[in-house]
């Protein structure tokens, strides 16, 4: 309520207080105590619905919902503002590609991301291979294009540690991203006994994970092999587990998009025309010059890493 409205309410009260006894009767003839009558008058004036125009962003979302727009999203790894900067150009590019309105929607939290995904609220998604695999198996999504470099993870400790297997690290501290990050889920999958699970010290950024192990903050860490090669030029780390290579992050599309439109999206994202609209996305995730064609088969089975995450199975 603005200052002008506050003065109106105040002056109204000054006028009506002398007549509170007469206000204390409602339309049915029953009596209300004077102060309750005044409170009712305040509530009616102060909390009546505003006729002001909705906020610009709310209005855009309302219009999008009314038009049944195709919803494009990605995990909440960025702030809403950063997400808009990275993904909005992609959404606009895809709108032109299929001739339908595609809107980018930031999920806000991982909980909202999971909930909306499971109920089919997202039509086009860019995220990790385990999520792509899950949507393919459970939500009838098709995987269209991917980051060309394959993913390998390494579980690391300092060389001087007398550890040679992951099993020896049960119950010990690990610097890692919070689940459901794929690297962390790969690590947790190595421990079947819940009472022997490692202690995850939530750490954002592969460089910070490496630094946490190097400084002794954590006994171990999990990082992509490609990142380890870049960080550990001095050879300070020992690899106690190296995963098999798996496909990388990818775009998937759901059943609200026809097979024809899904093909158009894949072709568009691989075309030279995508260079500008996807530039910030490719820079943020070090994709390289372009994406690569993907298929469902290569992602099959990776959803198993979500097996012990709440809500998926």
Residue ranges and their predicted role:
Residues 67, 73-95, 130, 152-211, ...:
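Bilobed "Venus flytrap"/periplasmic-binding protein-like clamshell domains
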Residues 71-77, 149-157, 233-273, 283-309:
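Periplasmic-binding protein-like
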Residues 86, 90, 109, 113, ...:
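Stable alpha-helical elements in mature extracytoplasmic
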Residues 126-138, 212-237:
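A ligand-binding cleft/hinge motif common to bilobed small-molecule-binding domains
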């Amino acid at each position: 309520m603005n200052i002008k409205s506050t003065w109106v309410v105040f002056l109204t009260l000054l006028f009506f207080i002398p007549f509170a006894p007469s206000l204390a009767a409602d339309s049915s003839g029953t009596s209300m105590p004077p102060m309750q009558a005044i409170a009712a008058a305040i509530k009616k004036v102060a909390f009546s619905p505003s006729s002001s125009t909705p906020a610009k962003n709310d209005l855009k979302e309302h219009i999008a919902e009314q038009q049944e727009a195709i919803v494009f999203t990605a995990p909440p790894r960025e702030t809403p503002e950063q997400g808009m900067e990275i993904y909005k150009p992609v959404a606009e590019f895809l709108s032109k590609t299929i001739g339908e309105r595609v809107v980018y929607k930031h999920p806000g939290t991982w909980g909202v991301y999971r909930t909306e995904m499971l109920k089919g609220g997202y039509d086009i998604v860019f995220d990790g291979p385990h999520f792509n695999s899950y949507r393919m198996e459970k939500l009838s999504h098709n995987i269209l294009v991917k980051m060309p470099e394959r993913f390998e993870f390494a579980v690391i400790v300092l060389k001087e540690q007398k550890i040679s297997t992951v099993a020896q690290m049960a119950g010990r501290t690990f610097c890692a991203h919070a689940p459901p990050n794929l690297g962390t889920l790969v690590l947790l999958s190595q421990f079947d006994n819940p009472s022997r699970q490692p202690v995850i010290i939530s750490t954002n950024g592969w460089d910070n994970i490496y630094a946490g192990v190097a400084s002794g903050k954590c006994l171990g860490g999990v990082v992509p092999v490609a990142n380890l090669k870049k960080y550990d030029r001095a050879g300070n780390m020992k690899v106690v587990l190296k995963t098999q290579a798996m496909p990388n992050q990818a775009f998937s599309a759901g059943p609200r998009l026809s097979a024809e439109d899904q093909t158009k999206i894949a072709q568009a994202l691989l075309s030279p025309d995508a260079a500008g609209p996807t530039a910030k996305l490719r820079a943020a995730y070090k994709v390289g010059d372009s994406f690569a064609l993907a298929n469902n088969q290569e992602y099959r089975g990776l959803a198993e890493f979500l097996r012990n995450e709440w809500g998926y199975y």
